[in-house]
């Protein structure tokens, strides 16, 4: 609700949503059938083409079912957000010269590309530090994660007092990399990679 309320007041905006824009349309299943794979391999094809391409590149992502009813709550919330944004006039990135643009992103995939490999576990302290540093080093105006280390003393460490207020939560870091991706799409489009099939979003 807060997101759509904020965006309603914007004349121009590019929004990157960290969720699938729709269900899978069976494109991966059809591709695998053409490649004459075994029925067991085809059964494991419940994903969209974008998810398949990410997995081919070693990036583990959740597959999107073919039915919205079978999708987890976070995916269904994403579908609802896309519908709301489209009703507000947002159009898919690069379709037209629209003032309000929308793109799908995947935070884990973004961090894998930016880190040059699979980053450390997202909820872990070191994973949060790594993600924050990746964004900070790319000029995103956020807290310098290295300040975290300046706040650690022997006393604080012995008492289990960590300056976690200097770090963003995993959810905030996901939102920040999505925003960074949207910014790149507008200002440095040559630095983003488009994957998947337009039929699936």
Where in the sequence are the language-model features?
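RNase H-like (RuvC/DEDD) metal-dependent nuclease/polynucleotide-processing core
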Residues: 1-201
């Amino acid at each position: 609700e807060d997101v759509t309320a904020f965006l309603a007041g914007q004349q121009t905006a590019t929004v990157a949503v960290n969720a699938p824009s729709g269900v899978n349309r069976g494109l991966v299943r059809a591709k695998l059938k053409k490649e004459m794979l075994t029925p067991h391999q085809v059964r494991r094809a419940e994903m969209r083409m974008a998810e398949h391409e990410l997995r081919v590149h070693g990036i583990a992502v959740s597959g999107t079912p073919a039915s919205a009813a079978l999708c987890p709550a976070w995916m269904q919330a994403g579908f609802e957000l896309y519908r709301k944004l489209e009703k507000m006039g947002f159009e898919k990135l690069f379709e037209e010269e629209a003032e309000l643009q929308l793109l799908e992103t995947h935070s884990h995939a973004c961090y894998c590309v930016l880190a040059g490999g699979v980053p450390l576990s997202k909820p872990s302290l070191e994973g949060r530090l790594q993600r924050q540093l990746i964004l900070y080093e790319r000029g995103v105006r956020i807290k310098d994660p290295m300040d975290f280390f300046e706040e650690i003393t022997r006393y604080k460490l012995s008492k289990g007092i960590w300056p976690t207020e200097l770090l963003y939560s995993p959810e905030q870091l996901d939102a920040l990399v999505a925003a960074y991706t949207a910014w790149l799409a507008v200002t440095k489009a040559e630095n983003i990679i488009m994957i998947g099939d337009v039929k699936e979003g």
